[in-house]
UniProtKB/Swiss-Prot annotation:
It is a single-pass membrane protein. This is Ribonuclease Y. HAMAP family: RNase_Y. Residues 293-385 form the HD domain. One of its GO terms (cellular component) is plasma membrane. Residues 166-234 form the KH domain. Its EC number is 3.1.-.-. It comes from the Bacteria. The chain crosses the membrane at residues 18-38. The keyword Nuclease applies. PANTHER family: PTHR33525, RIBONUCLEASE Y. InterPro entries: HD/PDEase_dom, HD_domain, HDIG_dom, Ribonuclease_Y, RNase_Y/CdgJ. Endoribonuclease that initiates mRNA decay.
Amino acid sequence: MNNNITNSIAQLFFNTSFFAFLFLIIIAFNLCLFAYLYFQYRIYKKNPKKANNFKANEYEKIKLLKNQNFTESNKLIATTNELNELTSQLDNILVRIINKPLAKLVNDFLDEQIKQIVKLDKNSSDFHSESDNLPFYTKLFNDFHFGVDKLININIKNPLYNWVYSPSFLISESDFRKLNGISGINKKLLVEKLRIEDIVFTDLNKKYEVNVLTESPIKAQKTVLTVRNILMNDYVDNERIESYVQQANFFFTEHCKKIGKEILESLNIFISSSSLHRHFGFLAFRYSFGQNVLSHSLETAFLTAHLAALIELDSELSLKCGLLHDIGKSNDDNGKESHTITGAKLAEQFQLPDDIKYTIANHHNKHIDNTYCRLTQIADKLSAARIGARSDSSLLFKQLKDELKKIVDKTINNFHTTILLGQSGRRLMIWLETKNQNQLLSNEQIIEMVEKIKAEIAKNPITNHFPIKVVIRYNFEHSFNTKS
């Protein structure tokens, strides 16, 4: 019994001693920590700088790194500005190159730059001695024989199509009855199915002059083909007219496919898309300022490929960029949409390479960051500016027609008007269509309208150079001359 009590007391004393010892250790640690903190406090009170020395050093390091980063950032900004300046200078140089007249362009840029690139010798066999005094661009064009007539043997002109924007031809009285139909029903159907503005018949004493009103050469070609089909057959009705229109559309489309395929394959460009062949073939019947678009595309393609070869770029890709840059002009129903937008859509449809897509969409832009597009842009300007490429008479005729259209729209603003300018600009025909079915014109109103048109034509510096016979048709025909 006593032994058990003794053991219990000993065990209790051991446990109590252990906890007491642990407690003393904790108290001693806290006292040491307090003493250290108090010592640090005394040092800080006496010398704060010494106490914060470590923090100051770290701060200086951070500040130094920040300054270094700021310096590097300034260098990067300066480099970026220099690059932007160089890019701007390059753009200005290229803009001057593209916008200068052809002679200045060559004298200031192409003549020296291309010579330096290819290191041409004046005695080189590439250019004969008789042309040594010619500008370099002339030698370049002569050497590569630019122009569709020399590049490929293909007839791209229709003899019935003239440069005044509307086919005009004579037919007999019986053919007139066939084309016009009873009360003009055949003519109305033709206009509707061919999607042209109008077909106008002018009585010339037992013969009729036919004028197809459309500014689309493609629609003009289809109309002429349809008229030929009608005149070759004795009997015509609505069903046959629709059939003739379909035949003309099919024949014309197949003809354009053949043109496109033959030209592309002659250039070793083998594309299986018949739709692309068709669009490319359409360019043979499109004109821009008197210049055939197919001819212009071929010139641009060959010049782009040659320039690319001189600076060791991909000539084949450059050829395709130049060849297809105006493919958007093939679309006859794009309305007011730019040919670059239409062309970009076609490029996506045909899954053309990215460089070609970019060139088609951007070759008229001022800022270009694609080398192939820039070369195509230069070649495009060279082809358009080449002497004889664009007809001055065609430009003047278009300018005259635009001015006369403005005068007519300004003077006769209450009517829908259609005009046809023929005889090299010396005969203007105006068709009036009332916007309101109940709107009628008296003889006095017609005469007043005539006097206004005559006065506007007389005071316009573009339209008053020579007499113009103006014919107004509204239920009856009224004609007058602008000069006696």
